[in-house]
Amino acid sequence: MSTEPEASAQPLPAQQSAALFRLMTWLSPAFPVGAFSYSSGIEWAVEAGDVEGAASLRDWLDAMLQHGAGFCDAVLLCHAYRATERHDDAGLLAVAELAAALVTSAERQLETLSQGRAFIEIARKAWNSDGLGRAVAACGEAIAYPVAVGVVSASHGVPLPATLHGFLHAVTSNWISAGARLIPLGQTDSQRVLAALEPSVIATGTRALTASLDDLGTATFRADLASLRHETQYTRLFRS
C-alpha cells in the first residue's frame, strides 16, 4: 500500500490558505457588520404579498441578483478592487461616491453605508495591512459595503473572482435569512432556495467581472419600490 499522499490531499499554498481564511471570516454571518438587521425591502414585499413562500422568494431574489442591487453592488466591488490594486485614488473616490449615491431609498443607503463603515472599522483593527489606510482615506467619508469589501480584499491580495462570488453568496444568504424569518420558512426550504439561486449567483458574478460602470442600472422596479415603502411600514422587524 502506497504511503504517498494523493493529489487531493495536497495542502493549499500558504498564501492561498490565508486568503481563503480571511475571505471566509470577512463574509461570515459572524463578522459584525449588522447585516442581520436589514432586509433590503423584503419585509415590505412579504407584507404586500409579493413574497409568500419559497418559490416567490427565489424569484424575487433572482431578479434582485441579476437585474437589481446584487448586480450593481458586484460591479462596484470589482471597480473598487481594481482601483485599490492600481493605487488609483481618484478612481477609487469616484467609485465610492457613485456607490453611495446609487441607492433607491434612505434606508438602503443606511444599509450599505453602515455595513461598509463597520466592515472597514473591524478590518483595520483586526486585519490591517499595508496600504489599507491610504485606500480607505481615498474613498472619502461614505464607503458602501461592496466598496469596503473590494478595498479590503485588494489590500490583502485576496483574488477578485473569489471575493466577488463570496460577496454575492453572503448577500444572497442574508436575503434568504430575512425572508425565512418573515414568511416564515424552515431551514430546509431556505437551503433549497439558496441551492436554486446558485446559477444566478455565478452568472451575476461572471457578468460583473467584465462590466463597466456604464453597465450599472436596475430593472427591478417592484423591489426598488419595496425599499421605499418600507420606510413608512407601520410594523417591522428590520431597518430596511
Swiss-Prot record:
Q: Where, subcellularly, is it found?
A: Cytoplasm
Tree of life domain: Bacteria
**Which GO cellular component does the record give, naming just one?**
cytoplasm
**A molecular-function term among this protein's GO annotations:** nickel cation binding
Q: What is its main location?
A: cytoplasm
Q: What are the protein's UniProt keywords?
A: Chaperone, Cytoplasm, Nickel insertion
- InterPro entries, per this entry? UreF, UreF_sf
PANTHER family according to UniProt: UREASE ACCESSORY PROTEIN F
HAMAP family attached here? UreF (MF_01385)
Tell me the protein family, please: Belongs to the UreF family.
Summarize the subunit comment. Answer: UreD, UreF and UreG form a complex that acts as a GTP-hydrolysis-dependent molecular chaperone, activating the urease apoprotein by helping to assemble the nickel containing metallocenter of UreC. The UreE protein probably delivers the nickel.
Known function: Required for maturation of urease via the functional incorporation of the urease nickel metallocenter.
What is this protein's name? Urease accessory protein UreF
Gene of this entry: ureF
